[in-house]
Amino acid sequence: MPQKDIGYLIKNINDKLKVKADADLKHSNLTLAQSRVLAFLDSKGGQATQKEIEVYLEVSHPTVVGIISRMEQNGHLRCWVDETDKRNKVVALTEQAKAMGEEMEQRILANEKMLLASLSEADIKKLKQMLLIIYNNLE
């Protein structure tokens, strides 16, 4: 591969990861963004507010509304208005989505293992540190 600037490489890595993840998830009728919502909800005990999902994904309100709406139509999520604060919409995993959790976690681990296969543990640790620095520079 010809020498490219770092931003270009990061973008291309992201694009390739998204294509691979979307292909892996197609049989589950999920996209990468939707799988991230499922993983987040799982980490929060199965439910969270729509606003919490927006903050976690770092995307706009309309983007989250679209993602959640499609997932609800596909039977992955249930949604309702929070009785204690009507401004909040609560989003929860369905039993169908909960059952997919273990398989999705295994796919994530397999993809990460493939991605980092030629790196040592020290290289991986250093890479994480450097990526966090770059990420924080953009804040």
Regions found by a protein language model. Give the residues of each.
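Charged, amphipathic alpha-helical coiled-coil/dimerization segments
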Residues: K18, S69-Q129
